């Protein structure tokens, strides 16, 4: 009998079966999202329709931390560059990842880890966070950092709205060279007014 049903589900009723599977998978995803919103106390963001990029967050925190520190931040074309500096373990990387995860969750229709979040739709999100060297290819950490930044600049020079996250820029070289390279990159990125940038060092 199972073979009989299986035969018809794969043949005569194949399109109906696929449609039911699609509906069920969507319901399962929506239910899981609803459970996550309630479990983690997430709030739904407000999307603003405008041509310029915007992220306005109140009480933003990292969703994976049990005792997170909440941040307030606002970024727009007039203030499109957030430069983070401070001692190690001060929370720079955590803030960058909190912003990135909140913006990503908002774009997939999820609640976000914040009291309130207003933002525009972004055309893309780019991160330069986990850069690695490649000994087999003879590529140093610094080389791959430069390549990632180069690829980032090439992508965002298209007039679209991007959120760009860069953690500890040029840490693969000495302090003086890192400072010179960072200043050059920052000055170039600040000219791209249609995108928002968060960079730590």
Q: What are these regions, as identified by a protein language model?
A:
Residues 4-7, 34, 156:
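Secondary-structure edge/capping motif, primarily at the C-terminal ends of alpha-helices
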Residues 1-24:
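A conserved P-loop NTPase coupling/switch region
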Residues 10, 32-38:
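Short intracellular "coupling" helices and adjacent cytoplasmic loop segments at the cytosolic face
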Residues 21-28, 50-56:
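Extended non-transmembrane interhelical loops and adjacent amphipathic helices
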Residues 24, 28-31, 150-153:
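A structural signal for well-ordered alpha-helices, especially hydrophobic packing surfaces
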Residues 36-201:
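ATPase nucleotide-binding head domains, primarily ABC-like/P-loop NTPase cores
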């Amino acid at each position: 009998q199972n073979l009989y049903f299986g035969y018809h589900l794969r043949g005569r009723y194949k399109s109906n079966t696929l449609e039911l599977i699609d509906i069920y998978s969507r319901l399962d995803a929506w239910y899981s999202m609803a459970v996550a919103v309630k479990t983690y106390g997430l709030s739904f963001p407000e999307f603003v329709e405008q041509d310029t990029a915007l992220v306005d967050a109140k009480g933003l925190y990292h969703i994976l931390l049990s005792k997170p520190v909440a941040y307030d931040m606002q970024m727009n074309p007039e203030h499109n560059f957030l430069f983070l500096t401070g001692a190690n373990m001060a929370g720079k990387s955590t803030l960058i990842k909190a912003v990135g995860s909140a913006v990503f969750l908002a774009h997939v229709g999820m609640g976000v880890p914040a009291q309130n979040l207003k933002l525009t739709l972004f055309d893309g999100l780019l991160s330069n966070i986990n850069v690695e060297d490649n000994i087999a290819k003879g590529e140093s950490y610094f080389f791959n950092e430069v390549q990632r930044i180069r690829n980032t600049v090439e992508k965002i020079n298209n007039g679209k709205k991007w959120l760009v996250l860069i953690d500890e820029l040029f840490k693969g070289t000495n302090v003086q060279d890192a400072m010179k390279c960072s200043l050059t990159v920052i000055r170039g990125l600040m000219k791209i007014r249609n995108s928002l940038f968060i960079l730590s060092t």
